Amino acid sequence: MRQPFLSGERIMAQFCTLCSSSSGNSSYIGYSGGGILVDAGLNAKQLCLAMDRTGVDPNSIKAIFITHEHTDHISALRVFASKFSVPVYATEGTLNALIKIGCVNGKFKADVIDENGIDINGMYVKPFKTSHDSAQSCGYTVDMPYGHKLAVATDTGYVTDEMKSSLVGCDLVLLESNHDLNMLKTGPYPYYLKQRILSKKGHLSNDDCAEFAKYLVHNGTKRIVLGHLSRENNDPVLAFETTNNALGAAGLLENEDYQLYAAPASNSERMFKL
């Protein structure tokens, strides 16, 4: 039984990863007035099951924001958006790519989000540039009605200046920690794929994530969720320890200065309430 919001309860901000890996990515951000999805990976049935596990009603979703057009971020998009009549937003380049591959079919509203952002039921969503091998990738910050700020920052080969400035002061950040460098370099992936992942248009490593996490915590972020972990080239414990050790070495105290979590690839039941 879905009971995400108890009668009379004011939920200021909620966040959960519905899925987070190289196989599928989708995050929920919401409050008592409804919620949004950032990306729609898996398939529509699996996505709805993931929402059910975390107590989110698909009918409460007011919009879907797409970071880029890669399959692990959009595989449920067309069916889910059509079934629940949910509007979809993406950068101009990403939206054009979605149209080209037939993901936008005219059964739901699809529109461009520009640098000015958009208000969705009191949630102010704004994109920031990332660096990925796609048409026009981005991450998103979400300013909630009661003052909290959350962000999804994955699929980038490095921390862009715009990403850095956009995330200052976020209360919670889903931050990419895609791969362990040694596991990737010695793993089974072909050379060209390893080079793609390691490039400036690839993915953040555990070490990259750890370095940026220090900056975020020093600038006010209290909760960091490590996301988009590779099943083949990473391990949740290793990802967690890499960033946690870096924060500790910088003189920051876990559970006092920050809280750190590694998002599971799927079957997440953790709903963060701010």
Question: What are these regions, as identified by a protein language model?
Answer:
Residues V38-G41, K62-E69, Y89-E92, A151-T154, ...:
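Active-site neighborhood of phospho(di)ester-bond hydrolases with catalytic His/Asp-centered motifs
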Residues K45-A90:
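Active-site metal-binding motif and surrounding structural segment of the metallo-beta-lactamase
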Residues S75-F84, K100-I101, N234-E241:
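Metal-dependent catalytic neighborhoods of phosphoester/phosphodiester hydrolases
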Residues E92-Y140, M144-G147:
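Metallo-beta-lactamase
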Residues N116, G122-H132, D143-H148, T156-Y158, ...:
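Conserved catalytic scaffold of divalent metal-dependent phosphoesterases
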Residues D161-A262:
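Cap/insert and terminal regions of metallo-dependent hydrolase folds
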